[in-house]
Amino acid sequence: SLRGFLKGVGTALAGVGKVVADQFDKLLQAGQ
């Protein structure tokens, strides 16, 4: 279903966003 597909995409984007945020935080800490 479209709703299930959109939910899957949203979950994937949230997962990727968390990973990117974690990496960005590490870069900021390393830069200090």
From Swiss-Prot:
Origin: domain of life: Eukaryota
Residues that bear Glutamine amide: Q32
An example Gene Ontology CC term for this record: extracellular region
GO process terms (BP): defense response to bacterium; killing of cells of another organism
Alphabetic keyword roster: Amidation, Amphibian defense peptide, Antibiotic, Antimicrobial, Cytolysis, Hemolysis, Secreted
Keyword Membrane: no
Protein purpose: Antimicrobial peptide, active against the Gram-positive bacterium S.aureus, and the Gram-negative bacteriun E.coli. Has hemolytic activity at 432 uM.
Name under which the protein is recorded: Dermaseptin-8
Species per Swiss-Prot/TrEMBL record: Phyllomedusa tarsius (Brownbelly leaf frog)
